[in-house]
C-alpha cells in the first residue's frame, strides 16, 4: 500500500525560511528621524516587471525600472516646514487687480521709443525705408 501512495508516507517538508528584507540601518548609520519608507527600500512598489523592447529602451528606463537598494536610500531626512503653505491655504495668494497702463520700452528700438501695436511706421528703424538701421 505504501508503494501505491508514496507521498502519504513522506514526511512533510518544512517551508524554507525567507530572509528578512534588507534595511538601510543594517548597512549604514541612519538618523533617528529617518522615516520608515527610507529605512525599508523593499516597501517601494510600482517598478516595472515586464521587459521593454530593447530597441526602444533608453538609459533612463533602465535606471528607473530597478527598485532602489539600501545603498541608494537617503541616510538622513530633513523635513521642510509647511508654515508658508498653511498661510496660503488660509488666506489665498496675493492678487494684484490694478490696471497696467505703463508703456513698455523696447531694448531693440531704444529707450525713447515705446512699443505700440498701432504705430506701424515707426516700429523698428530697420523697417523704415527713409534711413537704414545703421544710422541710429
From Swiss-Prot:
Tissues in which the protein is found: Expressed in airway epithelial cells.
Main location: cytoplasm
GO biological process: axoneme assembly; cellular response to UV-C; cilium movement; determination of left/right symmetry; DNA damage response; establishment of left/right asymmetry; flagellated sperm motility; regulation of gene expression
Region (Disordered): 1-24
Single GO cellular component term: sperm flagellum
Keywords: Cell projection, Cilium, Cytoplasm, Cytoskeleton, Flagellum
One Pfam family cited in the UniProt record for this chain: PIRC1_2
UniProt KW Cytoplasm keyword: yes
Superkingdom in the source lineage: Eukaryota
Subcellular location: Cytoplasm, Cytoskeleton, Cilium axoneme; Cytoplasm, Cytoskeleton, Flagellum axoneme
UniProt similarity note: Belongs to the PIERCE1 family.
Role summary: Microtubule inner protein involved in the attachment of outer dynein arms (ODAs) to dynein-decorated doublet microtubules (DMTs) in cilia axoneme, which is required for motile cilia beating. Functions at the initial step of left-right asymmetry specification of the visceral organs.
Subunit-level organization: Microtubule inner protein component of sperm flagellar doublet microtubules. Interacts with CFAP53, ODAD1 and ODAD3; the interactions link the outer dynein arms docking complex (ODA-DC) to the internal microtubule inner proteins (MIP) in cilium axoneme.
Name of the protein in question: Piercer of microtubule wall 1 protein
Native species: Homo sapiens (Human)
Lineage: Eukaryota, Metazoa, Chordata, Craniata, Vertebrata
